[in-house]
């Protein structure tokens, strides 16, 4: 069974995540280790992120697995090898969750990204990056966005 390109099969992704986590050998060091990785494992991380962004019945389970296990971050070397360093991706998950909440509220208020950008003194590109979880926002930025969206910023 291949990876579901449309991220429709979230139970399959949960199963694959558990299988990967159970077989991973974590070396307790602060360094990355150069290893050869099956490209399907690399692709799984990409589609897992898409499945989480899509939501659904298993989105919370997928996020929990990612955050508790410290899924590997990967970068491809020129020679086709991956450097794998383990770290906790909670910040990545939080950025995506916050971004989705911003986007949902903006759409609920019928604001365009350009209008929200003008209200917050940011660029539309920055708003887009925030909504897609590709920008680590400062508290000041989040405060301005929350104010523009008529929300209260809660840092709990």
Region spans (language model):
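Intrinsic-disorder/low-complexity detector
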Residues: 1-92
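Residues within alpha-helical segments
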Residues: 16, 20, 86, 106-107, ...
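Short basic helix-loop element that most often maps to the first helix and adjoining turn
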Residues: 100-116, 144
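Short alpha-helical DNA-recognition segment
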Residues: 110-128
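DNA major-groove recognition helix of helix-turn-helix/homeodomain DNA-binding modules
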Residues: 138-155
């Amino acid at each position: 069974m291949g990876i579901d390109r449309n991220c429709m099969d979230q139970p399959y992704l949960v199963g694959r995540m558990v299988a990967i986590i159970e077989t991973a050998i974590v070396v307790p060091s602060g360094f990355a280790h150069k290893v050869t990785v099956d490209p399907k494992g690399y692709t799984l991380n990409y589609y897992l992120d898409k499945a989480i962004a899509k939501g659904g019945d298993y989105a919370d389970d997928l996020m929990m697995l990612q955050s508790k296990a410290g899924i590997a971050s990967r970068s491809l070397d020129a020679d086709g090898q991956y450097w794998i360093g383990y770290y906790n991706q909670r910040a990545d998950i939080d950025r995506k969750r916050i971004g989705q909440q911003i986007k949902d509220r903006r759409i609920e208020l019928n604001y365009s990204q350009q209008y929200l950008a003008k209200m917050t003194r940011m660029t539309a590109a920055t708003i887009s990056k925030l909504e897609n979880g590709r920008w680590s926002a400062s508290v000041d930025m989040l405060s301005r966005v929350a104010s523009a969206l008529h929300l209260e910023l809660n840092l709990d």
